[in-house]
Curated annotation (Swiss-Prot):
This is NADH-quinone oxidoreductase subunit F. The gene is nuoF. It comes from the Bacteria. Belongs to the complex I 51 kDa subunit family. It is an enzyme of class 7 (translocase).
């Protein structure tokens, strides 16, 4: 359990103002120049030592990602912050954007300095109007105080930060589709390689990081890598914002240590499952794109490695709780419709497969399938998984795989007759 003094996001629920004056009282922008004066290599190494892994879902080492950026280049390079939070069940970045904007902006400055980028773009979800307004106000305050812009914080480093609003496409949360959109093109993922660190925004070296990943950097540098590494579990260090929704008594966002048990998280902060723990049916532990877990596996630790071992994933940390009243087949069918709608259509397996899977899922809801079609559906998910340019195909396949793995008997019980055509 996380100690109160170890919390990074002390205004996560908007108890206080998000303006610059209040943010400074909470420790933001405290002696930022001294951190910049320590040099780029220090910042990158400190973030590496902290064990910070990307909070957007992939869980890749943030410091390692920064180290991939080429050094001593004459052409521009960029930092891009992915604030296009669109994953069903996930709203952690939204609260950072609303209530802790200066943590993000200070993190942008430090990360930009670390990778040698004089320009940073915050790409925010189009529907986040109020959040975008808060970020823009915070940027205006930071420019006015000389914290960013020319000679940021008096360090001699120039850092300009721009806010760019998306247009509501889920696919633009994929890093290369985001870059395409930022360039004014249709948001469609790029083939990799080349990777963004070599050929990113406008053909220049680019690092793309999640909002939460960037927002924790200033606190890590102030308190030290060993402090952050001492929270959580080995290889799964630090704090994480979890979003708890669904059939709980008190849906909430909460910052906790990595590795806390899923059951403890729900019972301590969300008031427990509606009707008690025995009324639990299943939980999606990391946003809609990861496989669900049945009640028997729901005391797992909430970290990258433990959830992977359990057959799911930490993803974004969006916890969706489903009690016994849930039509689990329809719940997953609804997610299938989402991924069908959000597919960009570039890759044939995803373009054709997501629609096919949704149609079969809707027949499963009504029980109008043959038992053999369950295996056929599972085979199609495996043909889509790993055969697309980006991970949206995987995201569409995994919820269905989790459903069949853990609730096959419920699917079979609903099938009306094997003679259905």
């Amino acid at each position: 359990m996380l100690k109160e003094e170890d919390k990074i996001f002390t205004n996560l629920h908007g108890q206080q103002s998000h303006d610059l004056k209040s943010s400074k009282k909470r420790g933001d922008w405290e002696n930022t120049k001294a951190l910049l004066d320590k040099g780029r290599d220090f910042i990158v190494e400190e973030v590496k030592k902290s064990g910070l892994r990307g909070r957007g879902g992939a869980g890749f080492s943030t410091g390692m990602k920064w180290s991939f950026m080429p050094k001593n280049l004459e052409k521009s390079c960029y930092l891009v912050v992915n604030a296009d939070e669109s994953e069903p069940g996930t709203c952690k970045d939204r609260d950072i954007l609303r209530f802790e904007p200066h943590k993000l902006i200070e993190g942008c400055l430090l990360a930009s300095f670390a990778i040698g980028a004089n320009n940073c773009y915050i790409y925010i979800r189009g529907e986040f109007y109020n959040e975008a307004s808060n970020i823009q106000r915070a940027l205006d305050e930071a420019y006015k105080e000389g914290l960013i812009g020319k000679n940021s914080c008096g360090s001699g480093f120039d850092c300009n930060i721009y806010l760019h609003r998306g247009a509501g496409a889920y696919i633009c949360g994929e890093e290369t589709a985001l870059l395409e959109s930022l360039e004014g093109k249709k948001g469609m993922p790029r083939l990799k390689p080349p990777f963004p660190a070599g050929f990113g925004l406008y053909g220049c070296p680019t690092t793309i990081n999640n909002v939460e990943s960037i927002a924790v950097v200033p606190t890590i540098l102030r308190r030290g890598a060993s402090w952050f590494a001492g929270i959580g579990k080995p290889n799964n260090t630090g704090t994480k914002i979890f979003c708890i929704s669904g059939h709980v008594n008190k849906p909430c966002n909460v910052e906790e240590a990595m590795g806390i048990s899923l059951k403890e998280l729900i019972e301590k902060y969300a008031g427990g499952v509606r009707g008690g723990w025995d009324n639990l049916k299943a939980i999606i532990p990391g946003g809609s794109s990861v496989p669900l877990l049945p009640k028997s596996l729901c005391e797992v630790d909430m970290d990258f490695d433990s959830l992977r071992t359990a057959g799911s994933g930490l993803g974004t940390g969006g916890i969706i709780v489903m009690d016994q009243s849930t039509d689990i087949i329809y719940a997953i069918a609804r997610l299938s419709k989402f991924y069908m709608h959000e597919s960009c259509g570039q890759c044939t397996p995803c373009r054709e497969g997501t629609g096919w899977m949704w149609r079969v899922m809707m027949r499963l809801v009504k029980g109008n399938v043959k038992k053999s079609e369950i295996d056929e559906l599972l085979n199609v998910t495996k043909e889509i998984e790993g055969h697309t340019i980006c991970a949206l195909g995987d995201a569409a396949a995994w919820p269905i795989q989790g459903l069949i793995r853990h609730f096959r008997s419920e699917i079979e019980a609903r099938i009306k007759s094997d003679s259905v055509v």
